[in-house]
Swiss-Prot record:
Keyword set includes Disulfide bond: no
Location within or outside the cell: Golgi apparatus membrane
Protein name, as recorded: Beta-glucuronosyltransferase GlcAT14C
Membrane topology field: Single-pass type II membrane protein
A GO molecular-function descriptor: glucuronosyltransferase activity
Parts of the chain that traverse the membrane: 12-34
Predominant location: Golgi
Cytoplasmic side: 1-11
Assigned EC number: 2.4.1.-
Purpose: Beta-glucuronosyltransferase involved in the biosynthesis of type II arabinogalactan (AG). Modifies both the beta-1,6-linked galactan and beta-1,3-linked galactan present in type II AG.
The keyword Membrane is annotated on this UniProt entry: yes
List of glycosylated residues: N156, N285, N306
Length: 384
């Protein structure tokens, strides 16, 4: 029988220790045999980079939605909530003040359980496919950096995302990982996106209008940059606090330079973090090329498809802790709640921040991590 563990030494179950003993040895050898991020400018201390300390981490979640997403955000919050983490909820400016007020009332009504949850009162206008989406994400990051002092990874989720395992299992596995790893899907092989994303110049009216509209296209086109290399990937990320401090503060000016460049870039949220992390020597070796999501992809139309009950088995076998995109109140969400999350209609369980009780789901995530950090995948897929 597995035992719950708390954030003190030697509090993990014996099976977990035996399995992860080999895993940690591999990570330690891998870390020492490769160039580690510099601690001179990145703010990463050497002892922070080793996976020898199995303390429970903290996640900082940014959960975003738009008009009509209040109900979905509430359900998602309930599914991912753990008292050890931090949560920032944002309904963009297209949502009404009443929707934001209703969300804030919901959080206040469960104040004892949701004391680690914040709701953004001053909403951002977010244009689909525009850089205002990136600006809003950076806004959320800045708030979490200011309000929450001790988190380890930032994870962004939209109202159409949903977890595939309890937070206890994710926290359990991440407690064994080096705290410098950035989970971000990325590639420099952009193919057709060069002509449709990199060369066009767009203007996002969301920066200066109060009502949502589409982006404007300029007649001129631009060449590819020469001073940095473009990378693209998923908008979903799990990024470390030190890396995001670098993005916000930008002490070597790369993050600011790239932010200016991506102001006129279509779907800049699919390239900004990827390009920053892969063009900085202190962080390019910290990437794990995965966005921690299961996604059903349509290769012909180049878009994600809605996940249904038919995809349930594939979702589970993927080992991913999250999935996208779900229709509101789809039957598969109920199936996930019952079979994977163990949720009931009795409400939120009052948990203790320093206690983690993993279920059997951690084994699925462990398999995914071992595969991602295998020597044939890890370094070979970093910033290529």
């Amino acid at each position: 029988m597995k035992r719950s563990h708390i954030s003190s030494p030697r509090s993990y179950s014996r099976p977990a220790i035996s399995i992860f003993g080999v895993f940690l040895l591999f990570l330690l050898v891998l870390t020492l045999s490769s160039r580690k991020p510099s601690d001179s400018s990145s703010g990463l201390a050497p002892n922070r980079n080793l996976a020898t300390k199995s303390t429970i981490p903290r996640f900082a979640y940014l959960v975003t939605g738009t008009k009509g997403d209040g109900k979905r955000v509430k359900r998602l919050l309930k599914a991912i909530h753990h008292p050890r983490n931090y949560y920032l909820l944002h309904l963009d400016l297209e949502a009404s003040d009443e929707e934001r007020m209703e969300l804030a009332k919901y959080v206040r009504s469960e104040k004892k359980k949701f004391e680690n949850v914040m709701v953004m009162g001053l909403a951002d206008l977010v244009t689909e496919k525009g850089p205002t989406m990136l600006a809003s994400t950076l806004h959320g990051v800045a708030i979490l950096l200011k309000k929450a002092k001790d988190w380890d990874w930032f994870i962004n989720l939209s109202a159409s995302d949903y977890p595939l395992m309890p937070q206890d299992d994710i926290l359990h596995i991440f407690s064994y990982l080096p705290r410098y790893l950035n989970f971000i899907e990325h590639t420099s092989n952009i193919g057709w996106k060069e002509n449709q994303r990199a060369r066009p110049i767009i203007i996002d009216p969301g920066f200066y209008h109060l009502k949502k509209s589409g982006v404007f296209w300029a007649k001129e086109r631009r060449s590819l940059p020469a001073s940095f290399k473009l990378f693209m990937g998923s908008t979903s990320v799990a990024l470390t606090r030190p890396f995001l401090e670098f993005c916000i503060w930008g002490w070597d000016n790369l993050p600011r330079t790239l932010l200016m460049y991506y102001t006129n870039f279509l779907l800049s949220s699919e390239g900004y973090f990827q390009t920053v992390v892969c063009n900085n020597k202190d962080y390019q070796n910290t990437t794990v090329n995965h966005d921690l999501h299961y996604t059903k992809w349509d290769p012909l139309q180049q878009r994600t498809l809605n996940v249904t009950v038919e995809n349930f088995r594939d979702m589970v076998q993927s080992g991913a802790p999250f999935a996208r995109e779900f229709r509101e109140d789809d039957l598969v969400l109920d199936k996930i709640d019952i079979e994977l999350l163990g949720q009931t209609d009795t409400g939120l369980e009052l948990k203790t921040p320093d206690v983690v009780k993993p279920t059997v789901s951690w084994k699925r995530l462990e398999k995914l991590m071992v595969r991602l950090l295998d020597h044939e995948n890890f370094r070979a897929k970093q910033c290529k």
